[in-house]
Amino acid sequence: MTLARFVLALMLGALPEVVGFDSVLNDSLHHSHRHSPPAGPHYPYYLPTQQRPPRTRPPPPLPRFPRPPRALPAQRPHALQAGHTPRPHPWGCPAGEPWVSVTDFGAPCLRWAEVPPFLERSPPASWAQLRGQRHNFCRSPDGAGRPWCFYGDARGKVDWGYCDCRHGSVRLRGGKNEFEGTVEVYASGVWGTVCSSHWDDSDASVICHQLQLGGKGIAKQTPFSGLGLIPIYWSNVRCRGDEENILLCEKDIWQGGVCPQKMAAAVTCSFSHGPTFPIIRLAGGSSVHEGRVELYHAGQWGTVCDDQWDDADAEVICRQLGLSGIAKAWHQAYFGEGSGPVMLDEVRCTGNELSIEQCPKSSWGEHNCGHKEDAGVSCTPLTDGVIRLAGGKGSHEGRLEVYYRGQWGTVCDDGWTELNTYVVCRQLGFKYGKQASANHFEESTGPIWLDDVSCSGKETRFLQCSRRQWGRHDCSHREDVSIACYPGGEGHRLSLGFPVRLMDGENKKEGRVEVFINGQWGTICDDGWTDKDAAVICRQLGYKGPARARTMAYFGEGKGPIHVDNVKCTGNERSLADCIKQDIGRHNCRHSEDAGVICDYFGKKASGNSNKESLSSVCGLRLLHRRQKRIIGGKNSLRGGWPWQVSLRLKSSHGDGRLLCGATLLSSCWVLTAAHCFKRYGNSTRSYAVRVGDYHTLVPEEFEEEIGVQQIVIHREYRPDRSDYDIALVRLQGPEEQCARFSSHVLPACLPLWRERPQKTASNCYITGWGDTGRAYSRTLQQAAIPLLPKRFCEERYKGRFTGRMLCAGNLHEHKRVDSCQGDSGGPLMCERPGESWVVYGVTSWGYGCGVKDSPGVYTKVSAFVPWIKSVTKL
């Protein structure tokens, strides 16, 4: 596999161990406008308790060569159905709503024929039927289940978004029965109305047909004064009368102003005798918004059995009662047992019906239930602080969302613990719960409302927990809290011994293991810590994939007590508590031995070769670049964040060679370092080895590889008694361009252009290595941001020692002394070019002490040696 094809495979999601690559490659080029939709039509009316529809406008012209900013939905084989006229498809929105053409945040979809470069990047068989299609209806050509489409953002970039299949749904409100009322349309997550201008019977007939209330409708009008605050979506609707959905009619987007006569569109459908909806009431609740569902039928009140009772049924009940807010189903006589007959069983609503009478169900009085199974609902009004779980199979699981100022938003998982989960599930009416993996549920597109939430476990409501102010966070939606709650019973009990959390990892699936014992969080000593122990921890946290143990404070040293030592799991236990054989608090360890884990670990090596043709286009990619806050101003680097960082090691008879110098990978077989690294031990190739893919110097990892040295090339002008020409190349052992195996953790850096002036082209510069941290040499790879300085600083400070083949970099401020000591001799000084490729501009060479005031570090200027490097390496 060539390096170019390897990187393309990573872009298409073919290699499971690569996470976040798309954001690295494309964030600066394409940003989803989910957080700030483009400006567009004005909505003069809107509901105070619902989200205002996102503003949209037609997309700007497409870029000439658009590239997808993130991975498309995962490819799955699925046979597409041909046909030019859009009809209900199993791979689009469900039957009845196949004409949806906007994303769930309101952006209009592009026609499929307008984005051929995207389709050409995917397997042809999966996309063949969409090429050339002029429609822009939401589809799911990859068979992923949820339809999506491409859209254009305000900067002319192309992105993709999931669609809301309820968009365009209609209902009638305020009539004497279900066959008449004001027309309300569902768009962008909010119900709104239609201005009555040019509203006629053809338009009304389409509404009646869409609601399956007959094929003929009579146009009516309703005064806006009686509707309250509600958005107006359309005006001048112009249906022929034979359309199957109001979305297919010509119409104008409402642009504000005054609707003629201040009247909203309404209809009366033509059925002369329609079904009579049963009378419903809620009983046994603490307010009018909740209770046991009771129906009046055949002269008496009765209950509903909870067999197959879910939130879709609850939504219909709330709608029929005229109650807005969050609809939630309750089971097992949650609001007490009723009396009288059990009226209905096996109710299976889709959630779009106007009445329970329209839902599939048993015959009246036919059931196999007792009153212990009476169904209930709650229709919780939307007030600030209301919580819900969204995106799951039911109200018991999903993404945690909080309602605030008319909009649902998510909660960041920073510092999230099982105690927080207990409080959430308890407020939602469940006894137990656990944090779920975020990839089980789709990412949100709304705001992130809360961060750094900390509950004691005694709170009765989620908002009683300590937290940041509303909207203050440093997170992305990849860090949204997801939860699965359980109703109770031994099979769902989550109180499995002690609460467990993972701290200081790069994501919530990894980190230092901490347990909550005797009211205090503490760590676990790594004595005897193995993958079997890690598997139990990950299982307790809800992760099902492979688990890997990490030792020696791999994720940093914890604070507080060391609770547990000598854990002995077989790998089959349900919780950590089943593995503890030693008294709590008894140990002989320090925090430098804190245990850690990585859950859902997929560490397959991906082999690949570099070659001259592909190297220039794919070098300098940080495929595992993740959260920016962990990089800017940080010390510990991201694992795999600097994939070209390698170490030159001195071989020993014990096989545990000492780290001698840092170095930079330029290709599969060539490494760049400093000439002075060979001054003490000579240039015999048998004395050295090069380690690639390293992060923690004492913990072997799957991507790590130690390779012998075949050739050492020191610049011919270098003299050991001087610092000029301090540059060398090392050829690794192996066949041509097949020495180091490329992976997400092992990739080459880019070379600068000959005589390129980095101050003119580079920003965001870093030095990396296992160098001095102020206390000792680090076990984990360090990084430090460092500014490039004008050469006059070093010329004045170092006089004749500083030449034109050197760079000057460092921070001259008293409180920010960062220089080459925090890297390694021979290690890279990397800067980011526009377009997110990283270039090795300097090789760590020399300086006066570590962090000495007014003594910046000096680096060999790589751009001055590009012709020499290319002549030696043939790159």
Curated annotation (Swiss-Prot):
Instruction: Provide the tissue specificity.
Output: Brain and Leydig cells of the testis.
Residues annotated as site: Reactive bond homolog:
R630, I631
**Mainly resides where?**
secreted
The segment(s) forming the SRCR domain are 170-271, 280-381, 387-487, 500-601
Its signal peptide is 1-20
Q: Which SUPFAM superfamilies match?
A: Kringle-like (SSF57440), SRCR-like (SSF56487), Trypsin-like serine proteases (SSF50494)
Its recorded name reads: Neurotrypsin
